[in-house]
Amino acid sequence: MDLIKHIDNSLEWGQLEVSKLTLDVMNIHGITSNKIRCFLNNICSIGGTYLEVGVFRGATFCSAIYGNEVHAIGLDNFASPNLMPMGVSQKL
């Protein structure tokens, strides 16, 4: 497989929010966009090994592995329970 072409296709499909992800996976709370979730799902579609350091609630981790035959490792110490996306203030 041409990896450069696969990366280009994964980026394109991610921008269009096209992937194998279901609404259940897309609804996992996280600090990322749907485009990134779709990109990760597409880039991992050829298998391999996926490592994520900082899993938080699993939004990107689950998006990457959903429907893909991939070996996956997720690491987190869960020391930051109140993470927020950049530019969003936490409401008390």
List each model region and its residues.
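Helix-loop module immediately N-terminal to the HCX5R catalytic loop
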Residues: 33
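Extracellular/lumenal glycan-associated surfaces
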Residues: 16
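Conserved P-loop NTPase mechanochemical-coupling segment
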Residues: 19
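S-adenosylmethionine/decaboxylated-SAM
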Residues: 4-6, 10, 23-29, 37-92
